[in-house]
């Protein structure tokens, strides 16, 4: 099982800055699954360490997290029919090792880290190629 999440640019995987989501293979899949209509299940197989996510779904995940934490007043419940408690718990599991609510700063950092992977993906592709190693 992989350890650190990295993003591929032209299938030339670049080391990610920082240590966001290290050792969190299962947790990133659960967050994607909680936030996106498309399915990104965690199966426990070795191929879970390397996967692709559409940029549209990655953006949707960011927007759903903003909605779940009330950070964007332009997003309403009509935009997303998600289980807010499940989204928040998935965020907690991704960010912390303890089961306690995220602070506003932790949510901001999470969103910034997710945006980093989007910004550093291959601009010509419609998906992010992510891998843990």
Identify the role of each PLM range.
Residues 1-124, 133:
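Acidic (Asp/Glu-rich) sequence patches and key acidic residues
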């Amino acid at each position: 099982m992989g350890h650190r999440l990295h993003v591929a640019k032209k299938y030339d995987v670049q080391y990610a800055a920082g240590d966001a989501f290290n050792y969190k293979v299962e947790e990133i899949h659960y967050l994607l699954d909680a936030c996106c209509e498309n399915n990104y299940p965690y199966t426990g197989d070795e191929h879970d360490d390397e996967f692709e996510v559409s940029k549209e779904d990655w953006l949707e995940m960011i927007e759903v997290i903003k909605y779940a934490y009330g950070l964007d007043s332009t997003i309403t419940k009509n935009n997303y029919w998600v289980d807010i408690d499940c989204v928040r718990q998935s965020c907690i599991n991704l960010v912390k090792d303890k089961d306690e609510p995220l602070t506003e700063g932790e949510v901001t950092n999470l969103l910034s880290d997710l945006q980093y992977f989007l910004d550093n993906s291959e601009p010509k592709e419609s998906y992010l190629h992510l891998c843990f190693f």
